[in-house]
Amino acid sequence: VNKLFPKKHQLYPEDYDMVYEKQYRPSQTRIIDAAAVQTDHDIFKSFQKKECYGMPKPPRNITTLPSTTKVEYSRYMYALANYVKEAEHIEWYAFSRTPRQVAERITDILANAEWAVPSDFSKFDGTISDIVRELERMILRRAFHPSCVAEVLDLHSNQFNKTGLTRFYVKYLSGTSRASGSPETSIFNTIVNAFIAYATWRLSKVDGEYVEPDVAWSKLGVYGGDDGLTPDIDSDMYEKTAKMFGLQLTTETIMRGDLGIVFLSRFYTSDVWFGDPNSCCDLRRQLGKFHTTVKLQGVVPVEKLLEKSRAFYLTDRNSPILGQLVSKAIELNGGAPAMSKHHNLVRFGSDIPVENQFPNEYREDYHAVLDKQLPNIDYELFDTWLASCNNLYSLLSPPLIVEPEVAVTKHETVVDGDVARPIVTSTKLETVAENETNNPTNRPSRVHDARAFVAGRVAIASAHHVRGGVHGGRGTVGDGNVTIPTERQPDQRLGLRRRHRRGRGRGGNGNS
């Protein structure tokens, strides 16, 4: 806290004009206008965000705060964020930089590093603990003038331990978790992110001595939201420190010269260690959802295609597959389209000039990234199809260049009207064997025979695992995960069981 604010009590809340300037989307301006005439209630309202995922997983819960609380708290959070962005001694804050400057910061911190640790917090908002909340209170007390402290602490306390209400009127308690729609989300998540790295260094020993505060501060990398990149930090100690604060951190150690540096979903080349700032997006993730969007009134498919193409043309025109696709769209349109009437709904960063975007000059490593993510892409089929496209509408019907994978889930999940069932891992084979032993229709004579029986079924499943497909009612074998084959049931396809349409799914409130 002292490193963040060498001089205490320097900040005051921003004026209301700043809030109006920053929160210009229609949904945001409605909240601001409501704050002038409404009295706050003490309940959080939430809804599920409409977005694509790479696998079946719980949807993200978006929480909307009472209007007056949000507007007043925004004044303080903008003041805090502006300070962190502008302070010369804070070099690790990613959101104070343009995308190009973020890439340059990465090359700077890797220049003399022996290794680096990309990091990502899981369920960051949902795992904020009491001790993290106390850290935030300490920051607010030191940052703001004494005349403001009581108000900002009161506003801060109104961000958690509240009753929540979903769109379908299911009540829940928020606990100390962070409300996703709170003004504090971006700034505090980033500060907490950097703090965990700082605390890790302070808990580390060099030559038998704990790292001093000044040294720990100087060793910080770059952080933005739940993403981080820290040079030369011990990844085991890093995860252990996060756990001490109730947080879930995933790390990976990348040695100098190796491919694998990732930050803010940008994949950097192996030459980033030697000053090359070029990168590509997470191609698997972006290709998997490029063709999707929420239903927007008055927006037709070709228009959305051009808007997405315009955005990715700025950041990934030289990335394989995706860059080729968006470049073709721009070519067939006769050039990049201007910002449309729906400019406030387009991809984040679309308004940043190309000279300030992430550098994306062509590099062979982009193909290495893509081939690792999607090893069986049919490049020839894609190139042939793309060359045959002579208008924008033809781009809306691409061929299948990668076989789809079977949905892998920890819980029964509805996927396109089917129920995807949990994968049975090899560690559960003994349990499955015991279940088979107790099955009167399929009972081997001994437990040993049951294990052999299950192992045989796994072998059959493995033999029928072709290109990620599922055949004959048998499940998937890959990455150590298996589904025990079963006899095909009526209307059973791809290892998925069709649920009767009139019945409820397993989603909350009867929604699947």
Stretch-by-stretch model annotation:
Residues 1-511:
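Viral RNA-dependent RNA polymerase
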